[in-house]
Structures are given as structure tokens and as C-alpha cells.
């Protein structure tokens, strides 16, 4: 009796293992998808993340926003207000005669401002395809400055609830769905390239990692999910995050942002400018 039960269990294990291997081989040959590797990456995502190793340039939003308020309001009166009930609020159509001076913000101040604007204008979310995912910004850092362009790194926490809701409850993705954490730590690095016209910018992919995965592992993980579900590649998601950040800082006709909203108040353009060892985001007049 015991032998027959053990034999049955062994047969079941062999069947499941064989199914995974079979599916992996089929997907490798038809779609170049590494299902076993993706499952291993998903398991790695469950490991503890040392946030201090990822967030190397943290900011205190309340502390930094006080300085942001002073800097911006000294140029454009009452553009940023504060109340106990609503916190900081950016008025993109202030009752002001115009800009009195250039606005200059450090990377930490940019992080605080971007966080405030994204909460205010985008419900604290980033759009990935048809999904809207809650985010929290932990870091913004300017890594390089060339001819007004910059390499901009942001570290965010992203809530995966809406993403996991669209993963099928069927083999082979069901097991991956069940072990993806509710919060992923994303390090997003893009190059912001100024356009030929004032206030124009393009965001180009540089580097993108999640939790403890390397760049290559992150790309492989999202390649599988994109191939099977159409969620977007690592490069696409990275650019979406970088673009959301730049919409808050600069903006355009469709997206409210600091620099573009001040065009009618005397703003000429935005720029990334280096002073000593520090790089600043500036709204010029």
C-alpha cells in the first residue's frame, strides 16, 4: 500500500517536472522564452531587499518641499501652497505677473517636487500599457551632464497588485504570479535629451533593474512576460517611468509640469546645469 502511494507521488512529481521542462523547451524553440529562468528570477524577487543599497540619495519629501516652495514662490508668487489638510499643492496657473528669477532645484528637491506633482496630477501612478500602477519615489539623482542633457536615475517602489491581476491563473504563469511581491523596488535610469525647440525633451533607456536582479536578469524576466502577455519590455517600462518623471518637471500641452506651465509667465526653457560637483534642474527666463 505504502509503496503504491509513494509510486503515485513519484509519478506525479515526474509528470509536473516533465510538463515544466516540456513547456520550457516549446517556448524556447518557438518564442525564445526561458520559462525556467523566469521562474528562477521570480523566486529571487521574494528575497529581502536592502533598501539602503538601492536608495543612495534619499530625500525627505516634507523637508525638501519647504525649500522647493521658497525657491519657486520667490520667482512666481503663490505657485506652491501648503495646508494641514492637503499638504503641498502646485498651482499651475498662479495669479502672478510673471517669473521674477530663474528657478534652480537640486536632485533631492526635484524628487520631492516630482512626487508631489505625480500624486496631484496622476493619482500617484505610472501608466504601463493599459495598467495604472501606484508608485512611491525614493530617489532622484542626476549622474551626468552634457550640453544640457542629463542621465537621470530614479528609485521607486511600485505596487504590483494591478499587474498581478491580469496574469492568468493558468500554467505556466500562475506560479510566477503567486510569488511576485506586492512591492517591487525599481532603479530606473534614462538619458533626458533636450529637443531643438524650447521645452522639448526625449527620454531614452539606459539601465533598468528590479529588486536584487541584474540588468540582464530584469530584461529576461520582462521579455518573458511581454512575450506571453504583452506587458511591455524592460526598456519600454523604464522609459515610461522616466517620461512620467519628466512630465512632472517640464510637462507639455497634454501633461502639467513645472517648466512648461511657466511658459506664459516668462519661462524660456529648462536645462540641467552643473555648479561644482552638483547638477541642478533649472527653469530659465
Q: How would you name each of these model-derived features?
A:
Residues 1-285:
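Extracellular/lumenal and peripheral-membrane lipid-interaction modules
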